[in-house]
Amino acid sequence: MNKNIVIKSMAALAILTSVTGINAAVVEETQQIANAEKNVTQVKDTNIFPYNGVVSFKDATGFVIGKNTIITNKHVSKDYKVGDRITAHPDGDKGNGGIYKIKSISDYPGDEDISVMNIEEQAVERGPKGFNFNENVQALNFAKDAKVDDKIKVIGYPLPAQNSFKQFESTGTIKRIKDNILNFDAYIEPGNSGSPVLNSNNEVIGVVYGGIGKIGSEYNGAVYFTPQIKDFIQKHIEQ
């Protein structure tokens, strides 16, 4: 049977199931089939590297790049202020990760959609005595460079409320690099803004800022970490 027909049939059955309550497992199976089409998998253990280097906002993603320091987008950070909160590598379990207050926000001075945040070291919620940020996460390292056709992965929190703040990983390849812009075909959705783009060594080469939301799109975009951008980030990593 044609694969597309199978997927559509399963989706129709899932809708019926949600109404009748026949079998909730069918819904989950349908979602798994759809994600397989997109090369997307749910992260099973967010407490191991590189997944423990990814953090969640209420509707976006960020990642750890150094002591008490995370990277996201300007269009994400504009909705936050000092004292607001982020959550380290949640996995849908309210006891996992730790919730931390934002201490400072520094936007990149150019047009590139990058913002650096510094975080209070002690969690304000979760853990019997509060998690320590730097003991609870593992910072990502910069890649030296990248080139077209390199394999990449994107880790983040697509549709975070709908997906109960579970972490997902999508895979693909770099399609083009021009100046500070990197285009790739890994599938992304709303909520992936601020996600790290990693190479096969789990080194970060850029930060996602937007995409088409279509399977196979080659125009999903990230800010490519040039030497100038890396220098800006390094200057804002807490010492």
Swiss-Prot record:
The record's InterPro entries line, in alphabetical order, gives: Peptidase_S1_PA, Peptidase_S1_PA_chymotrypsin, Peptidase_S1B, Peptidase_S1B_tx, Trypsin_dom, V8_his_AS
Q: What class of enzyme is it?
A: hydrolase
Q: Which GO terms describe its cellular component?
A: extracellular region
One biological process term in Gene Ontology: proteolysis
Spell out where the chain crosses the membrane: none
Entry-linked Gene3D superfamilies = Trypsin-like serine proteases
Q: Which PROSITE patterns match?
A: V8_HIS
Where can this protein be found? Secreted
Q: Which residues form the active site?
A: 75, 113, 193
Q: List the disulfide bonds.
A: none
Signal sequence span is 1-36
| Ribonucleoprotein among keywords | no
Any idea which GO molecular function terms this record carries?
A: serine-type endopeptidase activity
- Keywords linked to the UniProt accession: Hydrolase, Protease, Secreted, Serine protease, Signal
Q: Does the keyword Secreted apply?
A: yes
EC number, UniProt record: 3.4.21.-
Q: Which family does it belong to?
A: Belongs to the peptidase S1B family.
Q: What is this protein's name? A: Serine protease SplC
UniProt gene name: splC
